[in-house]
């Protein structure tokens, strides 16, 4: 599983550099990374928490290096800029026992990923064929996830005792995350 996570990183960087991000290969690799993150987390293949977000930011940043971004995306740059005071404020409001670095990185990685994604996608045109390719790239790790759940999840009658979600039927991982990613697929 760690090899799979490493392969996504290495192949994604190689693929974007080789193609010089034409036609929006960074978006394709970002979609694949988002979809594969739950599978990687379930099997222990991530190196850090929020590995998928870091891959998305890396791939889209590489894509912006090759194909640029719209200069009119000022509102998204302002969004990223205004995240700085939130980091300062969060350090003041955290209690003494909290690991400040971990708390800040965990809470700020989502908005930063959203801002970078918005800057990359702003005024970027996609053909219908390219969109189908991105959806396909997003769907492939979901097939792997469904196969894993089919073989790993126990008999439902043995573990379901009520209407609450449980970790056993979701392959030993967070039921909300697994349900969300399968719902997107």
What are these model-derived regions, one by one?
Residues 36-40, 121, 148:
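Alpha-helical membrane-inserting segments
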